[in-house]
UniProtKB/Swiss-Prot annotation:
Pfam families: ABC_tran. The gene is btuD. It comes from the Bacteria. It comes from Vibrio campbellii (strain ATCC BAA-1116). This is Vitamin B12 import ATP-binding protein BtuD. PROSITE patterns: ABC_TRANSPORTER_2.
Length: 255
């Protein structure tokens, strides 16, 4: 279990606390500039005390933020918003760089994990392509495969947490479906998943817990039905919101 205690970064993110249980999918939502990326960067340890981060991220009573990044990488995977490296390697070489180090794992387990992940994101025909020739959506699927392999339990028994910052942004509708299948597959291994997300209808459907941020402040926290209310969303996003039910499933409609 992960306990975030009083995490903050100046005026960009005021102190907030919450927990993420094993297998729980937690979505962080809010308008642009509300502090979503700041929160995820602080929890991941890539934003540090030098940048003004305070608070604790406790995983099994150990503070993630006091560990070297090399040790953090065994416990959590972090995917920031889209970037493409300047170096040029094939997809399979990039995925090899993403594999966890230090664990005593067999080649067969690595092969099995890689095969499962690349099938989930449909990369089977892209393994020998240069990452520099991929479309934005293809590259994002490669990045998702890499970070999920970093925490995949059969090859990294120490993993506890997967952090994804706006992972659906470069994906089309069909590829978004693959993303949520991948998230479910990771969560099913007992790993908590923390996702910054803009598609509130996906959050309403897939999130176990939701944090709604506004101007660096935690507006509300709880189950999706409790947080994604017409009144709360209208207040935070400054737009009219209606919640409707179609075929027994709730949807949000924005003006």
């Amino acid at each position: 279990m992960m306990h975030v205690k009083h995490i903050a970064l100046g005026s960009r993110l005021l102190p907030l606390s919450f927990a993420c249980n094993p297998s729980e999918v937690v979505h962080v939502v809010g308008p642009n500039g509300s502090g979503k990326s700041t929160l995820l960067g602080a929890i991941s340890g890539t934003l540090t005390q030098r940048e003004g981060v305070s608070g604790q991220v406790l995983v099994d009573s150990n503070d993630l933020l006091t560990m070297p990044l090399s040790e953090q990488a065994h416990i959590r995977g972090y995917l920031c918003q889209q970037s493409r490296p300047t170096f040029n390697v094939d997809v399979f070489q990039y995925l090899a760089l993403s594999l966890p180090t230090g664990a005593n794992i067999s080649d067969a387990k690595v092969r099995d994990a890689v095969n499962i992940v690349i099938e989930l994101v449909q990369l089977q025909d892209k393994l020998h392509r240069s990452i520099q020739t991929l479309s934005g959506g293809e590259w994002q699927r490669v990045r998702l495969a890499g970070v999920c392999l970093q925490v995949w339990r059969t090859i990294n028994p120490y993993s506890q947490l997967l952090i994804l910052d706006e992972p659906a942004a470069p994906l089309d509708i069909a590829q978004e479906g693959l993303l949520y299948q991948l998230i479910n597959a990771v969560a099913a291994q007992g790993i908590g998943v923390l996702v910054a997300n803009h598609d509130l209808n996906r959050t309403l459907r897939y999130a176990d817990k939701v944090l709604l941020l506004n101007n660096g402040v935690l507006h509300s926290l709880g189950h999706a039905d409790e947080v994604l209310t017409e009144e709360g969303l209208a207040e935070v996003f400054q737009t009219q919101v209606r919640k409707v039910v179609l075929e027994d499933r709730p949807y949000l409609i924005f003006d």
